[in-house]
UniProtKB/Swiss-Prot annotation:
Keyword Kinase assigned: no
UniProt note on tissues of expression: Expressed by the skin glands.
Described purpose of this protein according to its UniProt entry: Antibacterial activity against Gram-positive bacterium S.aureus (MIC=130 uM). Shows no detectable hemolytic activity towards human erythrocytes.
Annotated source species: Aquarana catesbeiana (American bullfrog)
Name of the protein this chain belongs to: Ranatuerin-9
Length: 14
């Protein structure tokens, strides 16, 4: 799974 992508997405959301 694309963990880096999820982290980036969460960072934008938060």
């Amino acid at each position: 799974f694309l963990f880096p992508l999820i982290t980036s997405f969460l960072s934008k959301v938060l």
